[in-house]
Amino acid sequence: MKGIGNRESGIVDGQRNGASVGSVTTALPIPDSPLPIPGARKRAPRIALIAGEASGDILGAGLIEQLRLRYPNAEFVGIGGDAMRGVGCQTWFDASELAVMGLTEVLRHLPRLLKLRSAFRERVLAWKPDVFIGIDAPDFNLPVERWLKQRGIKTVHYVSPSVWAWREKRAEKIGVSADLVLCLFPMEPPIYAKHGVDARFVGHPMADDIAYQSDRAAARATLGLSASSTVLAVLPGSRHGEISRLGDTFFQAAWLVSEHLPNLHVLVPAANPGCKQLLAEQLSRSSLPVMRSHLLDGQARTAMLAADVVLLASGTATLEAMLVKRPMVVGYKVAPLTYRIVKLLGLLKVNRYALPNILANDDLAPELMQDDCTPERLCVALLDWFKHPDKVAALQPRYLALHAELRRDASARAADAVAGLLSQRESGMENRESAGAGA
């Protein structure tokens, strides 16, 4: 991973593969994933997909759009949401039926989920797809992929589980289920290669969506803040458990920062109404001035763009903060028993937790985990960013290089890889037909 930000960064005289910096464009064809020739197939391909979350629905829609450019008459069916339906996917079940979180909720819905999975795989097998694509949701998708692969259907898993962080041996088991794994991060394919699994780095769609140069002034105008304001964005998580563990600590840290920066504005985006209610309760018992605390409905990216510094939980949000080029402080806590078990068994294989730090193999953002995640230590780390603009400036080229590394037109690359798998399947069928005719 060392030096990842410098490898093929694609920023030369303000351009990337012919695209101007800050724009999102279609990448050039990938040499090792040749596009199929339209009309060369005997029939249009049938492609089945499952996306079990909103993020997967968006990924699925982008992939379908790119596959349709290659196969205009292709048929798409599966489990998805509004985004996939909007690009012509016939959804047999809605993605919301898979949207369960937490062990208790999963157990409560397990009989229904097992029944749905059984019904889907039987129906898709009868439909005879050329390929099945499971998008994220590994607990649901990998068993479906394995079952279909055993019956001769080509399978793809889009979005690798975090095999680089823990339980690396899962890579081999994933290979039993998927003919091809599409990875969002460059450190993932080498791990799969060690286990004999075909995995391709396609880039991260979020890196495609976010411009290289962010507009802080526009974000502040959207939120009614002046360009000269001092702003901290606070994101304790998007789940009830995370917010319960981190919210009070984060808001106490923000108050300590405000003691040094009296005109500080604090932006708190809430992922959903349930999170908003919990965050409102935590804010009400904090010492933060009401007039300078802004609880938002969603708008996490806008809050990050408007901020000078971001305080957030470890997770995908750290990647988003990196892509909008904001200095951050990362905190996280898990249940004490969970933490002891993980440490005792050595389940985690990484020394860093925040995605920017993992991608850079360097400490770009302070990480304060478990017992170190205290208001006082968070405050010290935050003030270090606020009071040293030279450090913030030095961070920008590092973030920009990582952004370029991930910005590969992910949907197009993923479609190229799927097209290659379809071509392999068709070649195999033609070879069998030729052998049969010769006999």
Swiss-Prot record:
GO CC annotation, single: membrane
Keyword annotations of the record: Glycosyltransferase, Lipid A biosynthesis, Lipid biosynthesis, Lipid metabolism, Transferase
GO molecular function: lipid-A-disaccharide synthase activity; phospholipid binding
Associated pathway: Bacterial outer membrane biogenesis; LPS lipid A biosynthesis
Pfam families named in the record: LpxB
Reaction(s) catalysed (UniProt annotation): a lipid X + a UDP-2-N,3-O-bis[(3R)-3-hydroxyacyl]-alpha-D-glucosamine = a lipid A disaccharide + UDP + H(+)
GO biological process, one term: lipid A biosynthetic process
Function: Condensation of UDP-2,3-diacylglucosamine and 2,3-diacylglucosamine-1-phosphate to form lipid A disaccharide, a precursor of lipid A, a phosphorylated glycolipid that anchors the lipopolysaccharide to the outer membrane of the cell.
Protein family per UniProt: Belongs to the LpxB family.
Entry protein name: Lipid-A-disaccharide synthase
Organism for this UniProt entry: Xanthomonas axonopodis pv. citri (strain 306)
